[in-house]
């Protein structure tokens, strides 16, 4: 990893949704959304992750979403392409495609469902490391993958050339300090939990791969900039403004509430792919109230 690339993977990186229309990837809406994200101050973009409904994208759709994001971003902000799979061979293929397309880095989730041991996790990420020449961000998300990568395994992986950091969705705030003490400040630590992102940075984190930033990119960027500058009074004010979104957008399975919010703001339809379905009326009311609280929706 070059020092320049590492220094750019900071702040608010949006875990982008993938818009659909009539069952197909809506590339026009996606490109417009990418432009808006950059205009609103997002520090980076992360397509084809969990929020981007990657499990229900075909391989060709997955690749096209990554290509469109990189093309539209045009180097203005870094693009960290989701490239995870519980098949090591597929993770390698997606990571290699992302590198060919011009991604700045890839985000690789810990393999889900098949529950590898720590030795298996190491072998999986080493295989991806050996197959590409761009930075790799480990995505550690035990609530979805069932397994939890240990700090010791992560430290071993950091010795490899391309392992650059972690998206930490463990919800264990003490992990930030443990990982920082084990690997040093050059190991990029990005929160995967919007509601705890302020505290995450206080422990030495470098930013957040944010779901809420889909809806409130400027506010999320301002929050991250305040924490990284040590202005926690300003950060707390922004946190209070964002907090109802940080909870309301997870009232049902992500990204259903996010897509509803974006449909209310006029960015795209709320269309999802099965087995995800549109949110219920009670959740719509929760999201609407959160949008109003943040000053994003005026009736």
UniProtKB/Swiss-Prot annotation:
Gene: dapA
Assembly: Homotetramer; dimer of dimers.
GO BP annotations, alphabetical order: diaminopimelate biosynthetic process; lysine biosynthetic process via diaminopimelate
Gene Ontology CC: one annotated term: cytosol
Annotated keywords: Amino-acid biosynthesis, Cytoplasm, Diaminopimelate biosynthesis, Lyase, Lysine biosynthesis, Schiff base
Domain of life of the source: Bacteria
Name of the protein in question: 4-hydroxy-tetrahydrodipicolinate synthase
Main localization (coarse): cytoplasm
Catalytic residues (UniProt): 139, 167
A molecular function GO annotation: 4-hydroxy-tetrahydrodipicolinate synthase activity
């Amino acid at each position: 990893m070059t020092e320049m690339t590492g220094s750019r993977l900071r702040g608010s990186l949006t875990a982008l949704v993938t818009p659909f229309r009539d069952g197909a990837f809506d590339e026009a809406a996606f490109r417009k959304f990418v432009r808006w994200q950059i205009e609103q101050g997002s520090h980076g973009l992360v397509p084809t992750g969990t929020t981007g409904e990657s499990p229900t994208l075909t391989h060709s759709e997955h690749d096209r979403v990554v290509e469109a994001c990189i093309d539209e971003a045009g180097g203005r902000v870094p693009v960290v392409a989701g490239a995870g799979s519980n098949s090591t061979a597929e993770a390698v293929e997606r990571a290699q495609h992302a590198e060919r397309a011009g991604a700045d880095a890839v985000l690789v989730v810990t393999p889900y469902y098949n529950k590898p041991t720590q030795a298996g996790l190491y072998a999986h990420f080493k295989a991806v490391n050996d197959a590409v020449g761009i930075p790799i961000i480990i995505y550690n998300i035990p609530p979805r993958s069932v397994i939890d990568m240990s700090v010791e395994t992560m430290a071993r992986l950091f010795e490899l050339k391309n392992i650059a950091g972690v998206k930490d969705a463990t919800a264990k705030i003490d992990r930030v300090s443990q990982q920082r003490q084990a690997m040093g400040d050059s190991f990029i630590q990005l929160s995967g939990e919007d509601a705890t992102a302020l505290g995450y940075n206080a422990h030495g984190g470098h930013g957040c791969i944010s779901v809420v930033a889909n809806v409130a990119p400027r506010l999320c960027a301002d929050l991250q900039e305040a924490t990284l500058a040590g202005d926690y009074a300003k950060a707390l004010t922004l946190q209070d403004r964002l907090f109802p979104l940080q909870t309301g957008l997870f009232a049902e399975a992500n990204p259903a509430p996010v897509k509803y919010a974006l449909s209310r703001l006029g960015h795209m339809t709320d269309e999802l792919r099965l087995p995800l379905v549109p949110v219920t009326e009670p959740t719509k009311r929760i999201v609407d109230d959160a949008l109003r609280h943040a000053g994003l929706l005026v009736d």
